[in-house]
Every structure is written in structure tokens, then in C-alpha cells.
């Protein structure tokens, strides 16, 4: 469970960036501003900010370059380890969808359906294809995780790898 659990931990860390620069760049300055979740009330720094839609060149791709591997690398490893089955894979599907949703909010279309273990630099999906694929993955993940919960399967071995609910998936 520890190898599988570590991949789940890696995916959860993508949800809320713990490292200071990542948190500032991804969660606050870029995701919040570009995604339209917040607006800056006072000018910060000098020219080249996201709230003026004129970011510094070095900042533009930071979330993408950071989050794509955080989402897809552990997901692909988990898919291989679980043969694309079971509650851990279902959990990973849900986390992958959330990460892709965040990236889409910042950048629009992203690569999703064609990303595999060989290459992340693949053709981008249109937003229609992206959202249809994300909803399909989300539905499958929720259905499989719900089946696991309803069956009463013991998931306590994953508790140390769940930052939020300690593997109590009834929550």
C-alpha cells in the first residue's frame, strides 16, 4: 500500500500547493486571478502581474509546467500498478479530474485524453472533448469508489495517505 499511497499523496499535494513559491504562483497569483476567483484590490509589485493580464514571461507557464507532472505522472503510475481498477484507481481518477479542471481554468484547452506514460507533450483536447472525458472519468471514479464504500471494504490501510478524510470514504 505504501507505493500506491505515495502516488496518492503526490496527487493530493497538487490540489493545494504546499511549497511556498508553488502556492503563491499557482494558487494565488495565477489560478485565482486567471480563473476569475478573486481580484487584486491593490497593485502589487511592478508591471507584469496576472491581475492586469500582463504577467511576466517567466511566470506564464509556471502552473502548467508544475502541475501537469504532478497530475499525470502519479496517475499513470497508479493506473499501471492497479491495472486501472479498484478504489485507489477510482480515487486517482477523481484527483486527476480536479487537477485538470484547475489547469483548464487557467489556460483553457489542455492535453488530457492522449497523455500517457510515454509523453505529456501531446495534442490538446478541445474543451468539449476535455469536459466530456473529465465527466466520464469522474462518473467512473465516483461509481467505483461508491461501490467500494457500500461493500464495506476496509480502506484503513490508506488512512496515512489521505490528508483530508483518513481514508473514510463515507465522508
Where are these regions (language model features)?
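Acidic, glycine-rich segments characteristic of secretory precursors and extracytoplasmic regions
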Residues: 1-36
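Membrane-embedded catalytic interface detector for glycan/lipid assembly enzymes
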Residues: 37-41
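Structured, solvent-exposed acidic/aromatic patches
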Residues: 42-171
Amino acid at each position: 500500500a505504501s507505493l500506491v499511497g505515495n502516488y496518492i499523496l503526490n496527487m493530493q499535494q497538487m490540489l493545494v500547493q504546499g511549497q511556498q513559491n508553488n502556492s503563491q504562483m499557482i494558487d494565488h497569483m495565477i489560478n485565482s486571478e486567471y480563473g476569475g476567483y478573486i481580484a487584486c484590490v491593490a497593485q502589487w509589485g511592478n508591471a507584469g502581474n496576472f491581475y492586469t493580464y500582463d504577467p511576466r514571461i517567466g511566470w506564464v507557464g509556471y502552473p502548467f509546467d508544475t502541475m501537469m507532472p504532478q497530475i499525470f505522472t502519479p496517475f499513470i503510475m497508479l493506473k499501471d500498478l492497479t491495472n486501472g481498477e479498484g478504489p485507489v484507481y477510482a480515487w486517482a481518477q477523481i484527483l486527476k479530474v480536479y487537477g485538470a479542471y484547475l489547469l483548464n481554468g487557467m489556460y483553457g484547452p489542455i492535453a488530457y485524453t492522449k497523455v500517457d506514460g510515454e509523453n505529456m507533450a501531446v495534442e490538446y483536447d478541445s474543451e468539449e472533448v476535455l469536459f466530456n472525458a473529465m465527466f466520464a472519468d469522474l462518473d467512473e471514479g465516483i461509481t467505483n469508489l461508491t461501490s467500494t464504500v457500500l461493500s464495506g471494504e476496509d480502506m484503513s490501510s490508506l488512512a496515512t495517505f489521505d490528508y483530508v478524510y483518513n481514508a473514510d470514504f463515507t465522508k
